[in-house]
Amino acid sequence: MKYRMKNRHMRYKILALLVVCVLSCTVKAQETDKYAQWGPTTQSGWGYMLRAGYVMGGTTPLPLPEEIRSIHKYNPEGGITLGVDVYKMLHRRWGVMAGLHFFAQGMSTEAEVKNYHMGITQGEDYLEGNFTGTDVTNTFMTGFTLPLMANFRISPRWSVHAGPYLSYLLKTEFDGSVFDGYLREGNPTGPKVNIDRSNPATYDFGNDMRKWLWGVQLGVDWRAARHWALFAALDWGMNGIFHSDFKTVDFALYPLYAKVGVAYHF
């Protein structure tokens, strides 16, 4: 009798173990199927996507220097981004991605500054020194970006990517005006030149901007459908927008832009 009961308990244990194994395999298969459902559209793991989005951001010193006392206005000059990415999934959850993106982006700001080193034009005169007053700046850039990123799938529908990028600028604009203040020529104690709103001084440093910029891109994608996705990304520039020998603005300005849009997966 004891032998029979022992065999019966053993059979129950084996049966329970088989049930657990079957359920585990089923769950794993379902999870794999979900990744396949939202994954690359080819068995090889290769795929590509088209992106279109809105760009918002600007160029900024990091950290904000003491010469900039307050920012009165900030208006992003709503830009666009259009691009194509090619990716290769090396595993169902991670892979690599590279792309070519066109962008047009800019901003307009109005700030209160003190002892802000500037080179300005008033009438036919060029003046350089330290300005205190209101500064209005406009920037705009167009070009192409080549990102190279690692891609990780958090879940079947969510993925994040990060990596370096290299940008080439086709068009560069950096101009503005100063008023409601004064300029000390040469240094903070030099001759004082008053500049009022009715006769502002202007500047244009567009030709002093670099053609090549590099930085880091961080982004996230969410699959809304088999082929359609929503994305958001941040491009953080690592080198300043001006040439290294440009000294009129005596601190570096870095491009910092966010992008949101839609993508179509092939």
Language-model features: locations:
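Outer-membrane beta-barrel "beta-signal"
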Residues: 222-226, 254-266
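Cleavable N-terminal export/targeting peptides
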Residues: 1-43
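Outer-membrane beta-barrel strand-turn architecture
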Residues: 88-92, 152-156, 224-226, 266
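Repeated loop/turn-to-beta-strand initiation elements of outer-membrane beta-barrel proteins
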Residues: 93-96, 157-160, 226-232
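Transmembrane beta-barrel strands of outer-membrane/channel proteins
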Residues: 50-56, 98-104, 162-168, 232-236, ...
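Short glycine/proline- and aromatic-enriched beta-strand/turn motifs that initiate or cap beta-hairpins
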Residues: 30-89, 209, 237, 265
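Extracellular/periplasm-exposed beta-strand and loop segments of Gram-negative cell-envelope proteins
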Residues: 58-77, 105-141, 169-211, 217, ...
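Hydrophobic, lipid-facing positions within transmembrane beta-strands of outer-membrane proteins
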Residues: 46-48, 78-84, 142-148, 214-218, ...
